[in-house]
Amino acid sequence: MRKGTRIALRVLGGLVGLILLVVLGSYVVSEMRMRKHYDDVRGTVVAIPGDSASIVRGKVIATLYGCTGCHTPTLAGMTMIDQFPFARLPSSNITSGQGGIAATYTDADWDRAVRHGVRRDGTPLFLMPSHEFNRMSDDEFGRLLAYVKSVPPVDKAPGSRTIYPLARVLHTFGAPLVPAEKIDHSTQANPQPPRGASLAYGEYLAGACKFCHGADLGGQKVGGEAGAPPSPPIGRASAVARWTEAQFFQTMRTGVTPEGRKLDPKYMPWPEIGQLGDDELRGLHLYLKQGVSQSASADR
């Protein structure tokens, strides 16, 4: 065997060994982190209203915050990701039907799961965006739970969950795949700003937009479904921010943009956003125009 060939084989063997070491180490580290217990997170019991107006409002919140996107409109769950070598991840059935969690969850359990990303057994949920719910006001969270509890039961068992090597490596090296790790669990929920046409209330509402449009509202690829279109930028440097108030209202209530493009309600929940009051939409529009800035290059 030639010397060059021997060196190449040694280098190749070293690389294979290094990869195996990284994968094995990532498995051990990620398993420890995913099995960590957050027993100090007790969960807060909030008042859950029973009136029809609160339930309707809760449905709007569930749509704005992506509950119906990840768990489906029936809240029975679906396979969110099925991509090797990343993961196979089903979302939970959150109704009270067979295979669902609602029948066994206490109000404190709901708070731990939704606003803290922690299961009933104290271990963290994987890819549950609780960091976006964590500061939701108790009043709004109560309305959300009122809606979830009102949804008819669906009998559906969740599929199996498998975390493949790539997800474990990404998790080990900092990818925020377990949001419970990045939440300050001692932080109290935000008091909800007065509902109305203010920058503060617009910022509060825009928290829901960040699920799909990104933390800076600069747009991003949305996971969960093959073929789902990327979300466009909607912050201060975007075309959306240049719409007039009347154009913004028209788009949110008809699903047709000033440019004549029809929004697909499967990906952009304009029917639910359109149920917001005029002052709420004014506040949201004000925030999108003034409150968030992403690079001008995001205007695409």
Predicted regions, residues:
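N-terminal type II signal-anchor transmembrane helix
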Residues: 2-38
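Extended surface/linker regions that mediate inter-domain or inter-protein docking
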Residues: 13, 17-27, 136, 140-199, ...
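C-terminal capping alpha-helices of c-type cytochrome domains
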Residues: 27, 31, 106-116, 132-158, ...
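Electrostatic cytochrome c docking/interface patches
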Residues: 37-63, 172-206
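Gly/Gly-Pro-rich "capping" loops immediately C-terminal to redox-active cysteine motifs
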Residues: 44, 48, 74-107, 124-137, ...
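Interaction-mediating elements
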Residues: 55, 127-129, 146, 156, ...
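Periplasmic/extracellular electron-transfer cofactor-ligation site
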Residues: 63-88, 116-124, 151-155, 203-229, ...
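Short, solvent-exposed interaction modules
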Residues: 112-121, 176-192, 251-252, 256-258
